[in-house]
């Protein structure tokens, strides 16, 4: 029987904790207003993740992780045609183009990024189906959820704190009144002065 609900009632943290503690195997689909995320787990560990709007082919993930430059990415996409990610991975390894670790670490980084993005969702419908495995042509990894949950929770708290400090990105920027303070006597780097020069009531946080 599928576990279904809304993130307003059952948060991403609670979902991942349940999957982790119960050592669940299956797929989790989360649908937001504008995008959807698909995750797969095996015995409570993340094995595959996909943002429905993104190109999640192996070649593109390797390009995003800077294992392939733009030219290499384009050539491989054209040359690889319709071969699967597993086949492409083996070809790249056998040709000494990349190592197995290069490929697995790039995939792991991408999958973790999908999870971290999901932590920012406060609304959306989810459905967990038991014993559903990733497509057989995809390369899987095994990522412990414990550290992801702790890191995701930490980032969420930081974001909530930031929202308390800056409730709207449309807020105007201005200096506070400090009588006697002369900016000419302040030592700042070039980049810091660029930021200072942007502070103007006409500008917002955007």
Model-found features: residue ranges?
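Acidic, Ser/Thr/Pro-enriched low-complexity segments and adjacent helix/loop capping patches
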Residues: 1-206
